Amino acid sequence: MKKTLLQINVTANWGSTGKIAEQIGLCVMAHGWESYIAYGRMMNPSQSKLIKIGTQWDVYEHYVENLLLDNEGLASRKATKAFLRQIDKIQPDVVHLHNIHDHYLNYKLLFSYLAEKQIPVVWTQHDQWATTGHCHYNLCGCERWKTECHDCPLSKWYALDHSRRNHRLKQKLLAKLPSLTIVPVSDWLDNNISQSHLKERDIRVIHNGIDIHTFSPQPTNAFERYGIDKQKKIILGVAAVWDARKGLEDFYELAKRLPSDEFAIVIVGQLTEEAKIIDNG
């Protein structure tokens, strides 16, 4: 009898995490498994069997509830209950979580169900949301998540600050999962998770991979095309869209500190309208 993998992510074969889930699905199918991907928002056609969680109206309701009550991951009750009934039919051997935030899923209902059914869970950590009271990325240098979130510095984004409640609830629910493997995708995330409430769980770093047939050295005239001096040391940064979360401010600081006659800083990707252009030579 085939084993079954169920992955859960905000998107299916769309965006970075959606494409990662798609590749994992292809991999397990090549080894004889059946693959399902449950998603909440955008999708592209997939080789896995797709399950849509909720409707666009559920997303809107979840967004409003989060904005007013700081309830990210605690709305979408009806949509999540319907999804759990589908899991009952699938009976997966492993549930692999990716990004379960972003207004589409109730994690309290999901984790309670997974604990009751004792289904092994793998959770790939693409950001910091699992270890905080609501942030998916620490924008302000706050380290309360290491002990307990409270009085969130970003509470101005919400009508109410329930970061302490949210942080405690995540700890309580995750502690009940009998088989949980945490997979950070970078050493930086691993370092953060190892200082959080998840530090005692099974943590295994698996770095994001790339297609080496596409991303490999090729003969090119890029230096000439973009006016880059070959004699300089090149500092390269690559992101789909550049903003503070992707480390753009670090490149600004490097441009100020490094001598322009020795270094060239090259940024690949889309810049936001607010981004500054610094000519460091």
Segments the model singles out, each with a brief description of its role:
Residues 1-2, 219-234:
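Nucleotide-sugar donor-binding and catalytic loop/hinge architecture
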Residues 30-94:
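A conserved catalytic-core segment of Leloir-type glycosyltransferases
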Residues 267-281:
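Nucleotide-activated donor-binding/catalytic signature segment of Leloir-type glycosyltransferases, i.e.
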Residues 183, 228-246, 252-256:
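Conserved donor-binding/catalytic core segment of Leloir-type glycosyltransferases
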